[in-house]
A protein has these predicted regions:
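ATP-binding/phosphotransfer module of carbohydrate and carboxylate kinases, centering on a glycine-rich
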Residues: 1-66, 70-145, 209, 255-401
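Short beta-strand-loop/turn "lid" adjacent to the catalytic site in phosphate-handling enzymes
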Residues: 137, 141-175, 331, 335-336
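Glycine/GP-enriched mid-protein hinge/lid loop-to-helix segment characteristic of carbohydrate kinases
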Residues: 111-113, 119-124, 170-199, 204-304
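Proline-centered loop/turn at the N-terminus of a beta-strand
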Residues: 147-148, 192-197, 362
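Short, active-site-adjacent cap segments at secondary-structure transitions
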Residues: 156-159, 200-203, 228-229, 238, ...
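Short, acidic, Ser/Thr-enriched surface-loop or helix-capping motifs
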Residues: 103, 159, 232
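Short glycine-aspartate micro-motif
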Residues: 87-91, 146-150, 218-222, 228-230
Length: 401
């Protein structure tokens, strides 16, 4: 029950608790009859009946119009109303901005991919806001029907200063106050807006829907234009004291640079991200325009490309060994444009790790591909939205409230 709910211990508070218990049962396990809900929750049938009546009046549950076969009187089947609210997920990538709109069951009702050609932070804010508006409209929704929005971005969002730190691949995105501008642009109709690191959302997405289902201690290592890491401990996202957990671009590797630009983009990112793979291939005489070209050549058996891939795997093993020494994860999920080549990387990574750490975690490819961050954004937004639609039940909507 929300902070503005009824006082604890009062009849109104008990009714709210019963309503939430019934609603959570329907969301978690699917549609059911009143007797089934009573058996599952331990509440009496009259209590369940009153809770269902209250929730139905608020638009949070509905009768499906179907009955279960069986002896005696047919029972009405109830379900949580998936359209009681909607959420938006956004993935801001260097080349593509992805937007999805989902109902409270997580079903995608609209999807939009927009090329990112922005050369300034202000242009990027406008482009993201416009893409969200178009996606919401294409779903046939009014802006106020969006309850929560979660945006994934490279770097470390700092809500206190409105700054995104460590995002050198997005022009102007580290400008002070840009986070406030983005949130303001997306919250015009009262939607709760959160901006989260993209690698963190990748981990959440794979945990919710992908390769890490049921795994409570895991690392999602994303490698592409940049390099990042999302950490889940006890099934929950671990951000660290300052929100910078997993910023492995800064991990020391090789000779440490000095001077004003020493931290841009970071020694590990310089050594292992996409451009490093291309540079290593060209140094061996290969013609490669992208890391994708290098992995394609390696699959075709080119010995020089195979050598580059094995060197990349050793660098990634170095990253994994560092985090494994502290976190001891059960699973490493590889994501991003380079990480998606786990079929070539996982073997040499395991061999390198076996020589340095006592327990080598499983290493697998992410299952969600380029949609992993978007899936994590939707999953995170749903957690917020489901609470908000319950806390706001019976209240008239006011834009900006």
């Amino acid at each position: 029950v929300g902070q503005n709910g009824p006082q604890a211990g009062t009849p109104a508070h008990m009714r709210a608790l019963n309503q939430r218990l019934v609603l959570d049962r329907l969301r978690t396990h699917g549609e059911a009859t009143r007797p089934r809900i009573a058996a599952d929750t331990g509440l009496s049938k009259p209590t369940v009946g009153q809770a269902l009546l209250d929730l139905e009046q608020h638009g949070l549950v509905r009768a499906t119009g179907r009955s279960l076969a069986g002896p005696g009187r047919a029972a009405v089947v109830y379900q949580a109303a998936p359209d009681a609210g909607h959420v938006v997920g956004v993935d801001i990538g260097r080349r593509v901005i992805r937007v999805a709109v989902a109902d409270l069951e997580g079903s995608i009702v609209a999807r939009l991919d927009e090329p990112n050609r922005c050369r300034s932070a202000s242009a990027l804010v406008r482009t993201v806001s416009d893409a969200v508006d178009r996606a919401v409209a294409s779903a046939g929704l009014a802006p106020h029907e969006v309850v929560a929005t979660v945006v994934g971005t490279p770097g470390v969002p700092d809500p206190a200063t409105g700054t995104v730190h460590r995002a050198p691949n997005l022009p102007g995105w580290e400008r002070r106050g840009v986070l406030h501008e983005l949130v303001s642009a997306l919250a015009v109709a009262g939607s709760d807006v959160v901006v989260e690191n993209d690698a963190n959302l990748c981990a959440v997405g794979e945990h919710a829907l992908g390769a890490a289902l049921g795994v409570d201690v895991l690392v999602c290592l994303t490698v592409g234009t940049g390099i990042g890491m999302g950490l889940l401990v006890a099934g929950r996202l671990f951000r660290g004291a300052h929100g910078a957990a997993g910023e492995i671009a800064d991990l020391p590797y090789g000779p440490m640079p000095s001077g004003a630009g020493a931290r841009r983009p970071g020694p590990m990112e310089t050594a292992a991200a996409g451009q490093a793979v291309v540079d290593a291939a060209r140094a061996l005489g290969l013609t490669a325009r992208s890391a994708k070209d290098v992995f394609r050549l390696a699959r075709a058996g080119d010995e020089r490309a195979v050598r580059v891939v094995e060197e990349e795997a050793e660098k990634l093993a170095y990253v994994v060994s560092a985090v494994t020494a502290v976190l001891d994860p059960r699973l490493i999920v590889l994501g991003g444009g380079i990480g998606g080549n786990a079929d070539l990387l996982a073997g040499p990574m395991r061999r390198a790790l076996a020589a340095t750490i006592p327990a080598v975690p499983d290493i697998v490819a992410g299952q969600l591909g380029e949609d992993a961050v978007l899936a994590g954004a939707i999953a995170t937004a749903l957690d917020t939205a489901r609470d908000l639609v319950f806390d706001r039940r019976g209240l008239p909507h006011t834009a900006g409230a």
